[in-house]
Amino acid sequence: EMQEEGSVHKVNHLMLSPNGKRFMVLYRWFCGQRKYTRLITCNIDGTDMYVLSDDDMVSHCYWKNDEEIIAFERKKDGGPGYYLMKDKTQGWTHVWPQLSNDGHPSYCPTNNNLVVFDTYPSRSRIQEIKIGLDNDTVGDSVKVLARVFSPFKYDNDTRCDLHPRWRQDGKAICFDSIFEGHRGLYIVNID
């Protein structure tokens, strides 16, 4: 499929590992109506390239540390969800198996197992910010921190993903939203 005439190739979601020695990137190519994605890691000098995931779909990713990456993807053997993967291996763990909706994960700077992530709008246009522990393979640790309304006028190209981000002390999360009718930056404190 990659070499079919008319295929379009793109890379995005480039992110350096915490020590700056490796990077990850989503390599995407489009062939007709079909989209393919691979999660690739590589040394900063271009050596030691590794296809970490070549399953049906890979979306948002985040380095946990210099050797592990959490990603939302649809694995052939596990379905859609968040997966914690070890770089340069095919080893992975399906975390929070009850969650099957894509979001933007990021790790707490003061707790290496705590992850914040968001959701896209539900049918009732509600988006959520959640936290959970990545060593939880049942889903008991997942808690909703905030629910916000996403008006229909902000959809498609003008949508506003929440993109939750940690404050450096791990005591608050900021996020983008349009629930007040305009784009804004908001903060939710962590108890």
Annotate each language-model stretch with its function.
Residues E1, L26-L52, E68-I70, R74-H94, ...:
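Beta-propeller blade-edge and WD-like acidic-aromatic loop motif
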Residues M2-F23, M49-A71, L99-D118, P151-Q168, ...:
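Conserved beta-propeller blade repeats
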